[in-house]
């Protein structure tokens, strides 16, 4: 895929709707149907070549947890772009012209169960802080996208539940412009703080309509806070809000009775 093509598509989508992957803002970036890769690629294989010579990153649902942390294929949080590319087996390019590893997103095409999309890595201060896979389109371009990602989302949710248990958090709400958002999140919690998270995030047309956007990925809140402290964006003594476990919440409620 030519860099100009990717940058044009992603720039267009940046002007549309965006969602948050945990505390990190993640922008949906997916190409319109007519621009999707033509090659039929198995999602169960490693990164493979399309008929146009592109390298497609595989989405391996079993590879989102390593040593108790939510991260993709063991890529350490705050790894360099080069380290991530070596593990993924592809070269990623800036989502927009002018983006760099100090603060930016880097993308490459992917395909999963017949749906074309992108993998995106968010970097801050030269380190990876989130990795996600995006399918479909944004709210501004949904009329040009005739797909429905409901079946794919259901499959991912089923697989994640089998692999990682029931989600720790489920969000279901209507957006101001009428479309519906639904999200699922699995959390790694240490000392009451969310360290890393795995998420599924979906956007639907109003009144239970078709799903036109799907994001699947992991992020590190701990890494993000660490970097922001290093660059002086937040104070050194900053502490994230403590997340209570269900047992702690129950004890707290009993104590107030």
Q: Which residues does each predicted region cover?
A:
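Bacterial N-terminal signal peptides that target proteins for export
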Residues: 2-13
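Bacterial N-terminal signal peptides
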Residues: 12-22
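Mid-chain, structured segments of secreted extracytoplasmic proteins
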Residues: 108-138
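Extracellular mucin-like PTS domains
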Residues: 41-45
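Intrinsically disordered, low-complexity repeat segments enriched in small/polar residues
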Residues: 6-7, 22, 36-38, 48, ...
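Non-cytosolic coordination micro-motifs
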Residues: 46-105, 130, 135-257
């Amino acid at each position: 895929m030519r860099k100009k093509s990717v940058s044009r598509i992603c720039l267009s989508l940046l002007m549309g709707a965006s969602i948050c992957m945990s505390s990190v803002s993640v922008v949906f970036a997916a190409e319109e149907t007519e621009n999707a890769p033509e090659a039929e690629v198995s999602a169960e294989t490693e990164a493979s070549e399309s008929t146009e010579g592109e390298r497609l990153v595989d989405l391996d649902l079993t590879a989102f947890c390593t040593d108790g942390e939510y991260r993709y294929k063991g890529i350490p949080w705050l790894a360099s772009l080069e380290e991530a590319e070596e593990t993924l087996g592809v070269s990623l390019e800036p989502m927009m012209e002018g983006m760099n590893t100090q603060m930016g997103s880097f993308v490459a095409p992917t395909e999963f169960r017949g749906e074309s999309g992108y993998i995106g890595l968010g970097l801050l201060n030269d380190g990876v802080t989130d990795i996600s896979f995006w399918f479909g389109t944004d709210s501004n371009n949904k009329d040009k996208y005739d797909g429905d990602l409901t079946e794919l989302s259901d499959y991912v949710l089923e697989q994640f539940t089998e692999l990682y248990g029931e989600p720790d958090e489920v969000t279901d709400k209507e957006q101001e412009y009428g479309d519906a958002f639904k999200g699922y999140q699995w959390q790694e919690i240490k000392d009451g703080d969310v360290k890393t998270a795995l998420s599924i995030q979906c956007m639907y047309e109003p009144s239970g309509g078709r799903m036109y956007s799907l994001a699947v990925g992991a992020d590190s809140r701990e890494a993000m806070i660490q970097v922001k402290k290093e660059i002086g964006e937040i104070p050194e003594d900053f502490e994230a809000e403590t997340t209570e476990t269900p047992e702690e919440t129950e004890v707290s409620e009993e104590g107030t009775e």
